[in-house]
Amino acid sequence: MKVTITSIDQVLPSVEITAPKSLALSHIDEWHSRGRSSLVWLYPKPKKPTQSLQLLDHLRSSLSQALNKFPQYAGKLSHSLQTGTSQKSKTRLCLTWGTGNDPGVHYITARASSPIDALLPPLGTSTGFTNGSGSYAWDRSGRSCIGLWPAVPLNKVYETCIQITTFECGGFSLSITMNHAVADATSVILFARHWSKTHELMVKVQTPSLSIAEPCFAPHLIDQYSTLELQDEGDNGKLLNKAHALPTLRNDLYESGARSLPDRLELSETYSVGDDIAVGDWERSGPMRSYMLHFSKEDINKIWESAKKEAGQDVSRQAAIVSYIWLAIIRAREWDKHGVCEPIKLFITFDVRRRLGLPDTLLGSPVLVTHVKFNGNDAISKSHGLLANRIWKTLSTYDVESVCAALYDITSSRPLISPAIWLGGRSTLFSSLCHADMYDVTFHETGPLLAAPAFAGMGGMIGLIKSKSAVPSRLPETYEDGIDMFFELDTESSIKLFSDPALSIFDGRALLQEFRQ
């Protein structure tokens, strides 16, 4: 699919900011500053001809209005010397806006040379992709939306980049990429929802005002927890010991002996290789195929019940699903045949907002990364129930005290190395957005046809989102409409994966037929 850029613009808040503002980001926000958050939404043609003609103008204008509630997203990150409560100066990553020199949002419009259907699952036209319960596997290789999100390096001039791409059929896509220090995926979705409602009120005056919680940009709310458990100076050692006893990802966990990175990652200065990084076996895995697996409610419950039979009640649905797929990927890549010298790791991102009693609308990246590991000959490598239980128990160790210890440790840590560097090998990163409804982002009275995380060429990542709801009023964390899982895998391993009897809920015959052609 050919995508041609038609315009590049700078978008600022519609209301002028009268005085410059600057805030130091929280330590955990800064920890994520070498990464990015990227999401994409695909929409059908607007219902009315006038809406199609005014589409780009309306999107740009409503974005400018939405930025009035998120003016910092038009600002710039920089390091500044800050004086803390102890009167000791420390360089902190600050976000500054309202200066008159704000870079604004990097706003790109583009045109695609294909209909939007080319990027959607072929349901209704290829029955071989579905089973009787509604679960299906979709090979989206070559249709993974790579050209729809801004190929602009962050940490250069802009912290927020947006691309609107129109298609031959009149449909369009919206993609947002932000520096991860400024916004995790939860924050990006909140921003997109506010933009959506601003747009709907602008183009249809009679639309009732739908209530969305106001964004909260207050980095200090997270930082206050990093010292919550400190009663005196002697407690810092205890906190660090507690933090280091947790399986939280830290830069000093990287293996020694970094090797060359594959050219296809096309790394910009956004990513920093750092010291002693374990690159893994990118060279072996080769070009990636991209997949989406849709799990129906019926199959989610079957997998969950199966896990509970093996491991008891201490298993969540998400832990059961990710362990089910992760073990299948391990078998497909034959990691379980490497023996005790080759640990297999699953890194898991988790939001600490709710664990600390903070609102979901808190902007930034209050996200920790923990991990589960085992060797290929461990019994757990043969049981998705036991593994699901391990995942559930690992996440359960992070109570308020443990999260505070991990946050305190981060105050003296280097920024996290991007997953683009250290994933691959026998490591996998799992992220879930099931708590944030990506499909509640409506433009021109129409919801998205497809919503997805925008990663490509990243064979070590698994992303999970809640599927499009048939009933918009459903609670965000129900599974009535199923869930969608996105991941990428090399061709050789893909053939083994979809030949695995354990994945019989997905009729892989159509996919295997594609490999033979």
UniProtKB/Swiss-Prot annotation:
Protein keywords: Transferase, Virulence
Classification via InterPro entries: CAT-like_dom_sf (IPR023213)
UniProt key word Cytoplasm: no
Domain of life: Eukaryota
Example of a GO MF term: transferase activity
Pfam family, one: Transferase
Residues annotated as catalytic: H180
Enzyme class: transferase
Pathway where this protein functions: Mycotoxin biosynthesis
EC number: 2.3.1.-
Family: Belongs to the plant acyltransferase family.
Additional observations: Gene clusters encoding host-selective toxins (HSTs) are localized on conditionally dispensable chromosomes (CDCs), also called supernumerary chromosomes, where they are present in multiple copies. The CDCs are not essential for saprophytic growth but controls host-selective pathogenicity.
Annotated function: Acyltransferase; part of the gene clusters that mediate the biosynthesis of the host-selective toxins (HSTs) AF-toxins responsible for Alternaria black spot of strawberry disease by the strawberry pathotype. AF-toxin I and III are valine derivatives of 2,3-dyhydroxy-isovaleric acid and 2-hydroxy-isovaleric acid respectively, while AF II is an isoleucine derivative of 2-hydroxy-valeric acid. These derivatives are bound to a 9,10-epoxy-8-hydroxy-9-methyl-decatrienoic acid (EDA) moiety.
Protein name stated in the entry: Acyltransferase AFT15-1
